[in-house]
């Protein structure tokens, strides 16, 4: 019988400490130097400044590093590393039957999230899955890299399996984002060197020929890039399901 370890994989040392630190430094620099551009391009913030309902109670300060030139070199290096990690994941999980894996697939744009320590409310999503609507059903794999570990707690927890993945700087965690992998982020706590937990992530998609999934450089973008599949959905349909 397969357990959580069959399709959930941890790869330590995936990103070097220096690359992790540089991502965090550039993230903070971007929020300071390009704060208005960050707000203008954010899918989490409405034009009136209110919270987008698709984010639920999340307060992750999400940032798209592909939209800012200072991340370009890091993103190219990360894309190459992620591509190799996916090939290793396929081998490690013994995915050998052709129908199990698409011949072509897309990568969602990278996103960095920051969760501040000791926030009991809005620290992140409670029990959830990353595929909860038709628009999200193109996702079939999640890749997440922990950029720091200088805090207590902050694990990724799977309640059904009663299993946790502990953040470790440079650690890559790969897992399916579907309904059967319910999970949540445990809030990070003090003592903490930076007062926050940072990670960078993406999803693999069944092929979707939209601009959202094309290329690493989105620095010329002038407005938030919403998934075309969501355009005809109401706010109620897009809202994060309440537990």
Question: For each predicted feature, which ranges?
Answer:
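Fe(II)/2-oxoglutarate oxygenase catalytic core
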Residues: 1-172, 180-243
């Amino acid at each position: 019988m397969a357990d959580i370890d069959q399709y959930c994989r941890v790869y330590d040392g995936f990103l070097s400490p220096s690359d992790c630190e540089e991502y965090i430094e550039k993230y903070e620099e971007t929020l300071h130097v390009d704060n208005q551009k960050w707000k203008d391009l954010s899918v989490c913030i409405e034009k009136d400044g209110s919270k987008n309902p698709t984010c639920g109670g999340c307060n992750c300060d999400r940032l798209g590093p592909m939209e800012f030139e200072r991340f370009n070199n890091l993103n190219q290096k990360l894309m190459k590393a992620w591509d190799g990690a996916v090939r290793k994941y396929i081998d490690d999980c013994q995915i050998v039957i052709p129908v199990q894996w698409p011949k072509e697939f897309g990568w969602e744009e990278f996103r960095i999230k920051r969760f501040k320590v000791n926030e009991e409310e809005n620290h992140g999503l409670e029990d959830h899955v990353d595929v909860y609507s038709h628009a999200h059903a193109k996702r079939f794999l999640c890749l997440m890299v922990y950029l720091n570990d200088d805090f207590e707690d902050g694990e990724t927890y799977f309640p059904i399996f009663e299993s946790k993945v502990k953040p470790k700087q440079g650690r890559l965690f790969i897992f399916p984002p579907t309904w059967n992998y319910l999970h949540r982020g445990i809030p990070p706590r003090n003592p903490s060197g930076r007062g926050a937990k940072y990670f960078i992530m993406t999803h693999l998609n069944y092929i979707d020929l939209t601009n959202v999934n094309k290329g690493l450089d989105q620095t010329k973008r002038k407005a938030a890039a919403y998934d075309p599949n969501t355009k005809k959905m109401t706010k109620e349909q897009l809202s994060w399901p309440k537990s």
